[in-house]
């Protein structure tokens, strides 16, 4: 037997997707929820403590990155755990927590989740204006616009979606065919932002 097969065979959670046996209680179902809310909690803790920093471009960058990451996490959650906004705007969405408080809150409607995401990502785009990074693991202006484009496309707002997509792609240089096979996992010119 091969090590890969033995490893997968020994772990029931690794086998579940291949046996079509994922259940609501399996880790494949809850890991995204836990991971996204952990990210949201971290972003909220940063946003709650921004006043301890002096007004500066660095503070704007930190606030913009936190808002964009929080928006990204809510967008991931809403697409995974709620119904589409265009057909079911009044259905339950996810819990929209905007502070690091642990007080129980009710689920917001899908529409309210999108309203909050739009508000946060638009503010993030403004705060991150002119930012760039040689590392693709930081949220920049282009990355925030990319997140905004996806949200507006979900809403069916193609005018704003196209506008944000164009801004996200404005500084992207396409790789040559030869570069593609050698730079798939590197900080290549076609990558706007990556999140792991």
Describe these PLM feature segments.
Residues 1-9, 13:
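Single conserved hydrophobic/aromatic residue that forms the stacking wall/gate
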Residues 14-81, 108-109, 125-129:
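Conserved, well-structured interaction surfaces
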């Amino acid at each position: 037997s091969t090590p890969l097969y033995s490893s997968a065979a020994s772990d029931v959670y690794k086998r579940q997707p291949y046996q079509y046996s994922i259940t609501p209680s399996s880790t494949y179902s809850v890991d995204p929820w836990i991971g996204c809310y952990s990210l949201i909690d971290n972003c909220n803790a940063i946003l709650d403590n921004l006043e301890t920093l002096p007004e500066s471009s660095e503070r704007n960058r930190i606030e913009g990155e936190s808002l964009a990451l929080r928006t990204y996490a809510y967008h991931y959650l809403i697409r995974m755990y709620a119904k589409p906004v265009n057909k079911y705007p009044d259905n339950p969405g996810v819990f929209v927590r905007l502070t690091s408080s642990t007080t129980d809150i009710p689920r917001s409607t899908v529409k309210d989740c999108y309203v909050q995401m739009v508000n946060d990502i638009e503010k993030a785009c403004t705060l991150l204006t002119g930012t760039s990074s040689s590392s693709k693991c930081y949220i920049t202006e282009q990355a925030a616009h990319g997140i905004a484009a996806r949200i507006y496309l979900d809403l069916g707002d193609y005018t704003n979606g196209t506008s944000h997509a164009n801004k996200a792609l404005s500084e992207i240089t396409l790789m040559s065919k030869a570069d593609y096979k050698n730079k798939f996992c590197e900080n290549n010119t076609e990558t706007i932002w990556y999140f792991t």
